[in-house]
A protein has these predicted regions:
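A short acidic, often aromatic-flanked loop/helix-cap motif at beta-alpha or helix-coil junctions
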Residues: 8-10, 88-93, 151-156
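Nucleotide-sugar donor-binding patch of glycosyltransferase catalytic domains
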Residues: 116-170
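Donor-binding and catalytic core of enzymes assembling or modifying cell-surface/extracellular glycoconjugates
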Residues: 45-132
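A generic structural signal for short coil/turn motifs at secondary-structure boundaries
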Residues: 35-39, 154-157
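Mid-sequence helix-capping/hinge segment at a functional interface
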Residues: 1-38
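Alpha-helical elements of Rossmann-like donor-binding domains used by nucleotide-donor carbohydrate transfer enzymes
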Residues: 15, 45-48, 74, 96, ...
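Short, solvent-exposed loop/helix junctions and linker helices
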Residues: 40, 91, 159-161
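Short, well-ordered secondary-structure micro-motifs
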Residues: 37-40, 73-75, 138
Length: 170
């Protein structure tokens, strides 16, 4: 799908530019909406990866709902300089998440709803899959790189995917 970002209301695009005014951002979407399938990659893996990208001069941006304070505080304590844009605004909307994602150089995500919002922006993205079907659920564009534990490690366990597997694709 080639979504035209200019269709987003200007208030969302303007807010995204205020929250993420520069470049060199790499986004992380780490939480799943449903819990009946184990499709979350270890938060420690995301933290390790975020710290590695900081060493490359990039800024990690975590897309985590603002009410998930325990997780946000854990990441803040272990990833200096990480940004949490959903804490910065009162507007809560898929349109704003999509506008924010358009400010990223790259996104790394598990299979979740935010991944689909990011996918609308046509930015490079690495998507990690475990038990879910990557052929069915991955965004469809040439900028998407898929790491599917079933294909790589013959396992439904997303945590068989290593930080190094992801880092190679950045």
């Amino acid at each position: 799908i080639n979504y035209d970002l200019s269709c987003l209301p200007n208030k969302f695009l303007d807010e995204a530019k205020k929250i993420l005014p520069n470049k060199n951002y790499i986004g992380f979407s780490v939480t799943q909406g449903n819990f009946y399938r184990k499709k979350s990659w270890s938060i420690q893996n995301f933290i390790k990866l975020a710290n590695k990208i900081i060493l490359k001069g990039k800024v990690p941006v975590f897309f985590i709902e603002k009410d998930n304070l325990i997780l946000i505080n854990k990441i803040k304590s272990e990833v200096p300089g990480a940004l949490f844009p959903e804490q910065e605004f009162n507007l809560s909307s898929p349109a704003l998440v999509t506008a924010l994602a358009s400010r990223l150089d790259l996104a790394i995500s598990i299979d979740n709803g935010v991944m689909h919002m990011i996918g609308l922006t046509n930015i490079p993205m690495i998507v990690l899959f475990g038990p879910t079907n990557s052929k069915k659920f991955a965004p469809k564009n040439n900028l998407i790189k898929i790491l599917d534990s079933k294909n790589i490690y013959n396992s439904n366990d997303i945590n068989t995917i290593t930080v190094e597997d992801v880092e190679k694709l950045i």
